[in-house]
Amino acid sequence: MGRRPARCYRYCKNKPYIKSRYCRGVPDAKIRIFDLGRKKASTDEFPLCVHLISLEKEQLSSEAIEAGRISCNKYISKTGGKDSFHMRVRVHPWHVLRINKMLSCAGADRLQTGMRGAFGKPMGTVARVNIGQIIFSIRTRDNMLANVVEALRRSSYKFPGRQKIVVSKKWGFTAYNREAYQKLKADGRLMNDGANVKVITNHGTLAQYAKDIAAAN
């Protein structure tokens, strides 16, 4: 029996049903990589941030998310190089889909029970997304804007419903606007923290404050 089309599971109809000790035998999600590209790049290297945002409340299958990730990664790697960006998948397929299998061969009516005991068996996983929720985020250099927008446009064809591409006003994956980030950087109050930054505040001991300022500069 083939895989049931994802259009059968597009809408969020019931409560979330996740893997647990009561829900066993769930097949692994097709997507295994949620962070790709140059993950260790500092915040100063990739100031531009672009998001792919959902415009509908729906369910995205793990197969669709993986297809979108591959499509996006392939285009940017080909046009700008595999070290020219850092991409994050911002949704996770936690919700478990069920299927009540029916036999369709000759003599099946003597073997199956119809809708008696119709609670199905796990068949796959999906991510439940809301209106305005971010699906993919990419940080990169300013001159890569056109390439990133095109990559996200191509990946959006892998998903049902409508999506929009938004160029963020924030600096990379940080929580600060460009002006605020550059001001904090000029004041020497930012410490690198992976793909993000930590702001040195006027709290704590003087010794710790001096240590943080020295590390930032």
Swiss-Prot record:
GO terms for molecular function: structural constituent of ribosome. GO terms for biological process: translation. One of its GO terms (cellular component) is cytosolic large ribosomal subunit. The keyword Ribonucleoprotein applies. Pfam families: Ribosomal_L16 (PF00252). It comes from the Eukaryota. The keyword Transmembrane helix does not apply. Keywords: Ribonucleoprotein, Ribosomal protein. Belongs to the universal ribosomal protein uL16 family. PANTHER family: 60S RIBOSOMAL PROTEIN L10. Component of the small ribosomal subunit. Mature ribosomes consist of a small (40S) and a large (60S) subunit. The 40S subunit contains about 33 different proteins and 1 molecule of RNA (18S). The 60S subunit contains about 49 different proteins and 3 molecules of RNA (25S, 5.8S and 5S). This is Large ribosomal subunit protein uL16.
